[in-house]
Amino acid sequence: MPEVIFNGPEGRLEGRYHHSKKEDAPIALILHPHPQQGGTMNNKVVFEVYQLFAKRGFSTLRFNFRGVGRSQGVYDEGLGELSDAASALDWLQSANPDASQCWVSGFSFGAWICMQLLMRRPEISSFVSLAPPANKYDFSFLAPCPSSGLILHGSEDTIVPKESVAALTQKLQEQKRIKIDYRIIEGANHFFHNRIGDL
């Protein structure tokens, strides 16, 4: 799990990278929760998802948004963080020019950024969105959603009500040419405490 440093829009960004031994391995980018609420690339959910992708043969990158850890810059209300994610994906693609697929995943705030990146990068083939904060952020830009994916949500999440995630999921499931798998993790709260293994 080597440490990597790559250029972002506002300076250096730090990450952790797992490189698959297979030349045409798929790639996955993992995005962390809100930088101003303690979110980092070392978040337990982010780390677990990173490990799961790596175990499935993906070349996988997780990184700190601007102003977090050793990443340069300051929080930018999501706009700059989306640019950071695009730079991270550029770096990941340059390290894996023969990748067979491109996936993105995000947790909470990271899920919101992940879905915006999905709209801007047609090479992204699928996504995994964990506890997308549909009660706090506008997801109407997903019209239409360009790729199939998975939405995970805890049944006991008190930060993001299940009604808001269910409504978002239903809107996506009504769209043609994509498949959205919606799974509720029973007993899990917003942070999937004691349920991370169920992911």
Report residues per predicted region.
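C-terminal catalytic histidine-bearing segment of alpha/beta-hydrolase fold enzymes
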Residues: Q175-L199
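Short beta-strand/loop motif that positions the catalytic acidic residue
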Residues: C145, L150-H153, D157
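Alpha/beta-hydrolase active-site loop
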Residues: V45, Y75-N96
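Acidic catalytic loop of the alpha/beta-hydrolase fold
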Residues: E156-V160, H190-F191
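Alpha/beta-hydrolase fold nucleophile elbow
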Residues: N96-F107
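Short, surface-exposed "cap/lid" segments of acyl-processing enzymes
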Residues: K21-N64
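Gly/Ala-rich beta-loop-alpha elbow adjacent to hydrolase catalytic centers
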Residues: G106-C114
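N-terminal cap/lid segment of alpha/beta-hydrolase-fold proteins
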Residues: M1-E23
